[in-house]
Amino acid sequence: MNIPHKRTGRRSHISRMRRSNYKWIYLFLLPTFVIFVLFYAAPIVQVFVTSFTSWDGFNPPEFSGLRNYINLFSNNGFLMSLKNLFFWCLVAATLHVGFGTLVAFVLYQKPRGWKATRAVFMIPNVISAAAWAMIYRFIFNNDFVVLNNIIRGVNPEFNVQWFYQSPWAFWAVTLTWLFYAVIVTLVVLGDLMNIPQELGEAARLDGATGWQFIRHIQLPLCRSAIGTSVICSLTARIAMYEQISLTTAGGPGNDTMSLSILLVNGILDYRYGYANAVGVVMFLIGLLILAVVNKLFRMDESDY
């Protein structure tokens, strides 16, 4: 007759322990939640709200409806920045990530010097984008024209002002971030190294060729790493500022204009409502990229 009481008491004790554990979990999560609300959620909400106002940063914001967005979409610089972003994203998703992934598969074969090469590939990750922009500014600078002198060895009449002539300026700016493909290499290579060796042995026993093993086993198992690389590469193009600001400042004309340059220009002109409207567009484009890439690469599915 006492057994049910013992079971009930045991269950209530376990229930109290679980509630106690949940309290500690919530307590430890509280600082993170507060930081997230104060420094992420609240600023995002403020940006959305003030994008519908006329605000100079000093006086109280005045509601202006859709005026900032109307001015934004009627601005040729904004439309050009969207066009540039589309082509930069296209280059990033294909050439940038594709080349980085290809190099990862080559290094996975462990050729001679592959460890040293992997170490060298860490260099772009520890040098700031501004520093790399200054290096490329020296390479393409019209006073030194390092690249032009090299090309003149083949074509003596070659003379291009890379950062000041269209369409060369666009591709010169593009070259300032293409070398970051080596970071893609490191990310994908890490996933390749984690693939169990048993899968390769089983594939060889089943008669799979090298290409079949790559296509049907390695690439599917690396889709999360490749998808993450695509997301990081595309969102970096949205926020790209240093490479443009230190080289072309969006010129010539608007040929290298970007959303981040428009946003900063709005702040410098004390048009905070307009700048926040640009920020909202950048935020929405980032969400769209995240949703599309996540859907294409099925990153929410388990690899094993």
Q: Positions of the model-derived regions?
A:
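A structural signal for multi-pass alpha-helical bundles of membrane permease subunits
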Residues: 21-304
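Short, Lys/Arg-rich, polar N-terminal cytosolic tail immediately upstream
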Residues: 1-19
